[in-house]
Amino acid sequence: MKFSELWLREWVNPAISSDALSEQITMAGLEVDGVEPVAGAFHGVVVGEVVECAQHPNADKLRVTKVNVGGDRLLDIVCGAPNCRQGLKVAVATVGAVLPGDFKIKAAKLRGEPSEGMLCSFSELGISDDHSGIIELPADAPLGTDIREYLKLDDNTIEISVTPNRADCLGILGVARDVAVLNELALTAPATEPVTATIADRFPIQVDATEACPRYLGRVVKGINVKAATPLWMREKLRRCGIRSIDPVVDVTNYVLLELGQPMHAFDLNRLEGGIVVRMAKEGETLRLLDGTDATLSADTLVIADHQKALAMGGIFGGEHSGVNGETQDVLLECAYFNPLSITGRARRYGLHTDASHRYERGVDPALQHQAMERATRLLLDICGGEAGPVVEAVSEKDLPARATIALRRDKLDRLIGHVISDEKVSDILNRLGCQVTQTADGWQAVAPSWRFDMAIEEDLVEEVARVYGYNNIPNIPTQAPLKMTQHREADLALKRVKTLLVDHGFQEAITYSFVDPKIQSLIHPGEDALILPSPISVEMSAMRLSLWSGLLGAVVHNQNRQQSRLRLFESGLRFVPDQRADLGVRQETMLAGVITGTRYEEHWDLARQAVDFYDLKGDLEAVLALTGKLSVLEFRAESHPALHPGQTAAIYLAGERIGYIGVIHPELERKLDLNGRTVVFEVLWDKLAERVVPEAADISRFPANRRDIAVVVAESVPAGDVLAECKKVGANQLVGVNLFDVYRGKGVAEGYKSLAISLVLQDTARTLAEEEIAATVAQCVAALKQRFQASLRD
């Protein structure tokens, strides 16, 4: 938003420089983007009057004038402007004047005629780009007055960035309020006494869409002269705010917009039929706008209509048919409050962005409409003449926004600001901001002013107090955050340690979204319900993940599509399982997962290209599990999982509790996901592994170890792991190593059976074992296997 510094100082004039004012406005939260002078650097230009104006004898486009500048004689000046005429008050650069660009005025002859100065245009004084003619000053402009003083050109245009929450500052009034508060000054607002109606004409107003338009004011003004000239002072104020003068009616509404921040509109009364109806548009209804374009309206667009047709898009843009033109004599002034939600997004939908929509989208003071109507009426009557009727109002009080009542606690204020501001100062600041303040036992209760709809919660008041008090006035106290060192438990297994191990095994860490495609997730976890997001980023990211596999498999497909065939990825993160017994109905569990695909080794001239298999990933996972020191109670059991190959899947158990799965992706799922080649995955509950068994130091036995090998025949259904576990249990005291080193099926072994070759390593820490003791332990193992598994020694 642009505005004139002098216009602002008409409302509130702190005794500070322009630079200090800009700094103050910025620190108040209205960032100043730029400050520019309203005119170029010049001097020696005064008000003059063209006393005589005659055609130049030697040039068709020049005129010879005699100009009175209040001196003891008339000046002879040659002028080429087409609007130069007798009796016109003009800006005269006298001999010795210096114009922008260091252009010095000297006495000279132009085509044989003497010229003792120059009649100036706006562009020649660096005021605007208008070079169509010389400046036309009001008839009452005093002769000889310095033009800088008369036009108040020692002024600056200040441009600020107004944040969406401070729509009240989209007008001089709002900025002036803030400056007044910061400097503890009173506002000097222009008089807006109610205009007495001199005619009884009323125009009916009916508001059907009361939620979208809780308040609508209309006023008939008849007999205006739309061809009257807009006063120079108003045109200059508009120009300094970046608004071009159009005609007095539009200029008045724009002036009120800039001054008060209240958009207004004027209809040609004689083009309206029946009365004003504020309603929602009919689907497909068309409206020709003021810029000549046609808009096809949607049913959620607010329109101002008469009894026959739509006249304007409410709060956005007027229509061509009912607009004011050069023949207009009677107008209906409109001033309304529109709900921001009824305007937001509508202008962009139609490719529009207007000053009105910019303000209505952010919110306009719902108590401002009467003041704006009276101000606009008075200005219009003063400039264009005419007679005004009474103000007609349609209002729905229940749909107007209520002023927020907010409690501010003393301890909350002190805690958030970090500095104690006296009670009297806080009350004074809130009162100056326009709040109705009541002091309570633990702080204050404030009713926000109607123009501050961004004041809604306690933190808003804290922010306002700090802003007005001045951030620079709050002492700079270094933040203190005492850190209490927690004792490190030796039994804790750090996730970072596991990640390092996996990286050492050739894995790369992946980080995928917690939001996944529900269709893909249902393929991996059929029949399981997931949390569905009410407002997802996209349909493909609308469900919370039930495992890390969805993201990891998606990463595999993504990389395979980019010619990366050999992949080893792992990820740690939360999964989200609906559970009514958990807090907020969702159980969040930290998981560790991995995936491998492609070849077992990087391409090498001496290594065969072998695809990864179940045991490759199982070995990597066992290395991770070994860090827990719980291998003795960890177990892999053949089980099924809907996402995994029925013959190459195992559940992972820790002390009898299932903590995860490992397996090859099911061929059907592999096809549906467009995976290229065998893919092996695992996933375990991290919390079950996060505590390790602390190893205890033990002496290395000084006595020899003895190995004995046995081959036992068991049924095909007997897991080798169970056989090894039974051996460990029987020889617990002296059996220090049990290992399966061969599996045989074939000649000499009956169908449905297998031969397991097992090495038994026996050792004692106190003595050398005798052969009889070794043989007895081996015999106990064989007997135990025979009893539990009906095993027999292979011949």
Curated annotation (Swiss-Prot):
Listed cofactors: Mg(2+)
Residues engaged in binding Mg(2+): 454, 460, 463-464
Organism: Dickeya dadantii (strain 3937) (Erwinia chrysanthemi (strain 3937))
Entry's localization field: Cytoplasm
Coiled-coil ranges per UniProt: none
Source superkingdom: Bacteria
Primary localisation category: cytoplasm
B5 domain residues: 401-476
Protein name from the UniProt record: Phenylalanine--tRNA ligase beta subunit
Subunit: Tetramer of two alpha and two beta subunits.
One record GO biological process: phenylalanyl-tRNA aminoacylation
